[in-house]
Design a protein with these regions (language model features):
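Short acidic/histidine-rich motifs immediately flanking catalytic phosphotransfer sites
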Residues: 1-6, 94, 373-376
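Phosphate-binding loop of NTP-binding sites
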Residues: 2-3, 11-156, 160-170, 222, ...
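P-loop/Walker A phosphate-binding loop and immediately adjacent motor/lid segment at beta-alpha junctions
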Residues: 22-28, 142-150, 170, 280-289, ...
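Beta-strand->loop->alpha-helix junctions that form or flank phosphate-binding loops
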Residues: 31-38, 76-79, 170-191, 209-215, ...
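Nucleotide phosphate-binding/pyrophosphate-handling subdomain across enzymes
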Residues: 114, 192-193, 202-322
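Short internal beta-strands
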Residues: 152-156, 295-299, 320-330
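C-terminal helical cap/extension that packs against the catalytic core
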Residues: 264, 314-374
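A glycine-rich beta-strand to alpha-helix segment
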Residues: 364-394
Length: 398
């Protein structure tokens, strides 16, 4: 029987975790996830993908394209890539692709050869002394971790990226819908299940089909495309990989559909838990399914995030047709006075949106046993245990 030689932990694991306690009692070395990734990068061409939103999807797309190109990469991701049925793979190729986590500053331990920054917004500020400026400085430091011949691929549409670019001190390539970018997106359209777009540089222009919904995912795809083009992967390989991409667990994942009376009911599960992410999900659904009613079951995630972005949550949650609010998922945090779902409901009603109900997890299923006036999408939104609720409900009613 092989003995444990080392334990690797993420910042989500508390010090009183029984496996961690046991490791320390047995004097087994304990290493932070980012420290291990940094060590692994010493022997690979490291690609680190960071940003407030979209890094899991972008990491998944890069890993899928490089696998399609027979590069056999090692990847470590924040979500399950459906085609691999895993969030990680140990490959024998030269590449190590990692989702870089800014939430606890651990991305600053990485020293990649290439980096991607998808966007920068206020989040996890509790780990930055409550200062957005400190978070911005951390992203600048992340980019400066690149070697002198490294390159950062950045979303040039992002307001904060634009602000910081002058201080990058490393070569960078920008992408986005705005014409000032090095790679410009255009001709975006959707057919309800796929996205179509063109990506143009000074020298080339290519058409792509992406098996995902939403302009935000087109931006994620653009980051992956630019990186893979820079690494010498053929355009046809990239096009085929994006067209056949099977998605990521809980990233606008269509669980399925069923008939309720004469109406179609479509079920979508989504991990987004920041107001910007929720807004992008709503926009993507409205664009792709304009004739459907949109009902959302939302589980707020963390008391600190809900407090810091309270007004933004009130604004974005009012854009659905009907909202079902679950209790806040603490993620190990202590409650904050006045920050709770009943107060969110009250604030929404005061803002003029009154089609909002408070539910516990056992009551959610009752909302699916009702006749529908029209075709409807139920989206389960949040980063807590709402996924287990959505899966059990869909299995029960499909």
């Amino acid at each position: 029987k092989r003995q444990v030689e080392m334990v690797v932990k993420s910042s989500a694991i508390s010090d009183d975790n029984p496996e961690l306690v046991s490791a320390k009692e047995q004097l087994i070395p304990v290493l932070a996830r980012a420290e291990m990734l940094s060590s692994l990068m010493n022997n690979k061409r490291g690609i680190a993908i960071a940003g407030t939103h979209g890094k899991t999807t972008t990491t998944s797309l890069v890993a899928s394209i490089m696998t399609s190109a027979n590069l056999d990469p090692t990847f470590i991701n924040g979500g399950i890539i459906n085609s691999f049925n895993s969030n990680a793979q140990l490959g024998e190729g030269d590449y190590l692709i990692v989702e870089a986590d800014e939430s606890d500053k651990s991305f600053l331990l990485l020293q990649p050869s290439v980096s991607i920054v998808t966007n920068i917004e206020p989040d996890h500020l509790v780990n930055y002394d409550g200062s957005f400026d400190n978070l911005k400085k951390a992203f600048l430091e992340f980019i400066k971790k690149l070697p002198f011949n490294g390159v950062s691929i950045v979303c040039g549409d992002d307001t904060v990226v634009k602000e910081l670019k002058i201080n990058f001190q490393r070569p960078h390539i920008s992408y986005g819908f705005e014409s000032s970018n090095d790679y410009v997106l255009s001709s975006y359209r959707t057919d309800g299940r796929n996205s179509y777009f063109k990506l143009t540089s000074d020298t080339d222009s290519f058409d792509f089909k992406l098996n995902m919904l939403g302009k935000h995912n087109v931006l994620n795809a653009a980051a992956a495309i630019v990186l893979c083009l820079q690494e010498g992967i053929a355009v046809k390989v990239i096009q085929d990989s994006l067209s056949n991409f099977m998605g990521i667990d809980r990233r606008m994942q269509i669980l399925g559909e069923k008939k309720i009376g004469s109406s179609t009911c479509l079920y979508i599960d989504d991990y987004g838990h920041h107001p910007t992410e929720i807004n992008k999900t709503i926009q993507a659904i409205r664009t792709s399914f304009p004739d459907f009613e949109l009902k959302m079951v939302f589980q707020p995630h963390r008391f600190t995030r809900t407090k810091d972005l309270y007004e933004e949550f009130i604004e974005v949650l009012s854009h659905v047709d009907e909202l079902f609010l679950l209790d806040i998922y603490s993620a190990g945090e202590n409650p904050i006075e006045g920050i709770n779902s009943p107060n969110i409901q009250s604030s929404l009603i005061r803002s003029g949106f009154d089609n909002v109900k408070l539910l516990n997890s056992n009551e959610v299923a009752k909302e699916y046993d009702k006749d529908l006036a029209k075709d409807t999408i139920f989206v389960f939104q949040g980063a807590g245990d709402i996924s287990s609720i959505s899966q059990s409900i869909f299995e029960e009613f499909k």
